[in-house]
């Protein structure tokens, strides 16, 4: 096993939010400062653009494919819808997504630009970061942010000559304080039994980067999120860190985050001990059961009760994100319907000054 570190520039998305003449005004618009920072993570399920490059999955390319420009644009609209639902679930104003959105399975920076272009005015995302996939890879991780992206770094695990998906490390300037976001999309469980070993290598890499950050900056504020492709009981070295499913998810009896809840610790989450009212208890549905494989980990400084603090964690299942069966409404290319086979997860960080 070897590691390779790469640096990538963040994308300035000023051009997304309107014509060139109006960008400055749009970027100066601000949402009310509630003292809260909201973050969403979402595996978008094979989000390719409409231009064929050869790396797409078979069903997305070729003359017989049902994939088209029209269906791509429709998927962008649905992704915006999911992001807005994530905003509502984390207490943002109506029609506004979370402050930071981490997306997995994005084909390229162009897709990130296209989705960013669907958010305007005070709800716009002026900043973004995207780490290109390795040659031959189908997709990677993208990040949209209302806060300046100070730095982006990618770390990759190479095992048996195969580059695993990168660990993205983005530093955001959140109202004068740095927040480091580690974003991942780990090896899936499909294939042979070696996938568990590969995920362990990715877990060790993330732990190594967290320890390196905390060694240089004790008390650093950081979160780690994404599709980890494993549940809480399958972690090894990360099991000692606070996690949304067991550390800052709250009981169903507590009030749901809404735009009216702008202070204090009143938050909501999907309990891991039982089903929610909708039957949802996880972010992914597999083999007849819910699994919590999309995670948020957080630094000790965000859960120790001092200053900025994780106020809550929840799965987003509103709108049409669930199929009539009660499972995630996965995207089906043959019909052009659906969203993703995962549900978004969100957190709210309270008392951020």
Q: Which residues make up each language-model segment?
A:
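Bacterial N-terminal signal peptides
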Residues: 9-20
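N-terminal, active-site-proximal structural segment of metallo-dependent hydrolase catalytic domains
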Residues: 23-118, 129-134, 323-337, 350-353
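Metal-dependent phosphoester-hydrolase catalytic domains
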Residues: 24-28, 208-222, 230-353
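Active-site beta-strand/loop signature of hydrolases that rely on acidic residues for catalysis
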Residues: 39-44, 72, 79, 83-112, ...
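Short, solvent-exposed loop/turn and secondary-structure capping segments
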Residues: 50-54, 112-118, 140, 153-156, ...
């Amino acid at each position: 096993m070897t590691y390779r570190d790469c640096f990538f520039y963040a994308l300035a998305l000023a051009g997304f939010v309107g014509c060139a003449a109006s960008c400055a005004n749009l970027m100066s618009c601000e949402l009310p400062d509630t003292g809260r920072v909201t973050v969403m993570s979402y595996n978008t399920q094979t989000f390719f653009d409409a231009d064929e490059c050869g790396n797409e999955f078979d069903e997305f390319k070729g003359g017989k494919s049902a994939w088209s420009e029209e269906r791509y644009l429709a998927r962008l609209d649905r992704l915006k819808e999911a992001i807005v639902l994530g905003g509502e679930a984390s207490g943002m104003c109506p029609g506004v997504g979370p402050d930071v959105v981490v997306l997995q399975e994005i084909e390229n920076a162009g897709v990130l630009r296209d989705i960013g272009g669907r958010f305007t005015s005070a709800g716009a995302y002026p900043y973004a970061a995207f780490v290109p996939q390795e040659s031959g890879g189908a997709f990677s991780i993208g990040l949209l942010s209302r806060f300046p992206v100070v730095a982006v770094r990618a770390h990759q695990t190479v095992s048996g000559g195969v580059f695993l998906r990168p660990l993205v490390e983005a530093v955001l300037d959140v109202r004068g304080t740095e927040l480091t976001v580690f974003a991942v999309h780990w090896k899936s469980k499909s294939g042979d039994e070696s996938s568990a070993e590969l995920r362990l290598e990715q877990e060790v890499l993330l732990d190594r980067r967290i320890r390196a950050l905390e060694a240089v900056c004790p008390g650093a504020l950081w979160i780690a999120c994404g599709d980890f492709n494993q549940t809480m009981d399958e972690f090894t070295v990360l099991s000692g860190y606070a996690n949304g499913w067991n550390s800052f998810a709250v009981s169903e009896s507590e009030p749901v985050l809404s735009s009216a809840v702008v202070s204090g610790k009143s938050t909501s989450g999907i309990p891991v001990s039982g089903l929610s009212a909708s039957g949802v208890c996880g972010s992914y549905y597999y083999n007849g059961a819910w699994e919590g494989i999309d995670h948020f980990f957080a630094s000790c400084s965000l859960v120790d009760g001092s200053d900025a603090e994780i106020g809550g964690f929840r799965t987003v299942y509103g709108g049409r994100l669930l199929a009539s069966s009660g499972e995630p409404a996965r995207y089906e290319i043959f019909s052009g319907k659906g969203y993703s086979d995962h549900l978004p997860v969100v957190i709210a960080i309270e008392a951020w000054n």
